Amino acid sequence: CPTSYGDSPYQSFSSFAGNPYFIDLEYLCKEKLLKKAECESFPWGKKADKVDYGVMYESRYKLLKIAFERFLRAEPDDFEAFCEKEADWLSDYALFMALKDANGGNAWFSWEKDLKMRKPEALAEARSTYAKDIRFYQMLQYLFFKQWWELKAYVNEKGIEIIGDVPIYVA
């Protein structure tokens, strides 16, 4: 789940979405969405044994935006099918994240009233206005789940089961 400020898995934006922090950048290099030199050109924090989430967030999202521009030039054949299959949660999640960005990262209850109240006209206008940003968040989930399913298949072949936890404090 994508985490909120404080980076706690129990303070997330979705119970369904995968955390973009776990998208493997080397994998994106192999897919020609990023270049190794681009990944190496960004700061990742001063200490190898400590995660600086602020620095990581800034660098990672800049790189993911670069990957997105390349992704748009040749969307994979299965991308649209993924978006349709996961539409029950992905459509609203991607819209929410795009609106959160458009509102400076502020909480939804501080947004324009018609958006807060999910008025159909306001949501339709937002979907049109922020279509590219929505696509970015859909791409992040596509990449996350593509990698997740490959990892899960690999470890399951080795007789390893993965267990996890569900974020229940979504607000």
Predicted features and spans:
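Acidic/aromatic-lined carbohydrate-recognition and catalytic surfaces
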Residues: C1-A171
